[in-house]
Amino acid sequence: MPFKSLDELRAACLDLPAGSDTAAKAVASRQDTLTKPQGSLGRLETIAAWLARWQGRDMPKLDRVKVFVFAGNHGVTAQGVSAYPSEVTVQMVANFAGGGAAINQLARIAGAELDVIPLDLDHPTGDFTQVPAMDEKAFLAAVSAGYDAVTKDLDLVCFGEMGIGNTTPAAAISAALFGGGAEKWTGRGTGVDDAGLKRKVVAIEAGLKRHAAALADPLGVAAALGGRELAAIFGATLAARHLGIPVLLDGFVCTAAAAPLARLHPTGLSHTIAAHVSAESGHRRLLEALGLPPLLDLGMRLGEGSGACLAVNIVRSALECHARMASFAEAGVSEK
């Protein structure tokens, strides 16, 4: 386990490589020579430079792309915050293994490997309206599981999650980190009715009140109000930064899971791109707070890494244009 204390983890969050300015500038310079008006490929151009910065090479590659789906169960579901029972988490992990979920199809189309990592599904986190979701030991174990999952031979990673009830901790973390109260951040998740939405708001308000003493520390927020799969995504996002691997973030839960890193370090999420904006109401607000403009807006709210996986082919397109387009000189095309 790479992190044996919160102090060790905090130190790792403050020691973040900045990426390669040289590689990013080389990509930008090449983009300006290609057979197109400068800047006309929009974000495809900046995506190519982003890849170069974090891979540390002026000709990035996407030979190995992997989607990680972390799964966990939540004690706060006892408050009636989800339309589905917690056993669906285990059932969906089996569905992933059988190839029957949306993420299986999207990963295949994207040319990405899929790694599903269940986290102690038989032991839900604590109900954060009553106790911290995780004590220090459980939190560090989950963070370490995510950190250890990411390996240096990967070129791009996507993070997703599965966990019945996990939009509730996502909203709670967002409220704790950025303020505004529970109602501002709370949506319908898997489709709760008005009464269920009210229960979510009440549960989040109770959690924020009970754990008020922990809310000044982003790591305290993640432990008290989060979940194992969220902590693992946090750890995986940190590992990717240390290893120089760019990250596509999925929806609301995934973004909330990574958000404490941005509160610990001003450039904590610079190696990430928000793949899409979810239909879950808090996600757009969270992306705005983090300064992460999404690539896609398709009205999705599935999770599983589905939106992140869809964005892989946009990143592939950016790289293909950068690598294979001719320059004006090579093509014999006159410049203005």
Swiss-Prot record:
- Could you tell me what reaction this enzyme catalyses? 5,6-dimethylbenzimidazole + nicotinate beta-D-ribonucleotide = alpha-ribazole 5'-phosphate + nicotinate + H(+)
Task: Kindly list the biological process annotations in GO that this record carries.
Answer: cobalamin biosynthetic process
Write down a Pfam family by its short name: DBI_PRT
Pathway info? Nucleoside biosynthesis; alpha-ribazole biosynthesis; alpha-ribazole from 5,6-dimethylbenzimidazole: step 1/2
What Enzyme Commission number(s) does the record list for this chain? 2.4.2.21
Q: Which InterPro entries match?
A: Nict_dMeBzImd_PRibTrfase, Nict_dMeBzImd_PRibTrfase_bact, Nict_dMeBzImd_PRibTrfase_N, Nict_dMeBzImd_PRibTrfase_sf
Provide this UniProt record's keywords sorted from A to Z. Answer: Cobalamin biosynthesis, Glycosyltransferase, Transferase
Q: Per its UniProt entry, what is the enzyme's top EC class, as one word?
A: transferase
Q: What molecular function does GO assign, one term? A: nicotinate-nucleotide-dimethylbenzimidazole phosphoribosyltransferase activity
Active-site positions on this chain: E304 (proton acceptor)
Cross-referenced CDD domains: DMB-PRT_CobT
Q: Give the family per the record.
A: Belongs to the CobT family.
Role of this protein: Catalyzes the synthesis of alpha-ribazole-5'-phosphate from nicotinate mononucleotide (NAMN) and 5,6-dimethylbenzimidazole (DMB).
Q: What is this protein called?
A: Nicotinate-nucleotide--dimethylbenzimidazole phosphoribosyltransferase
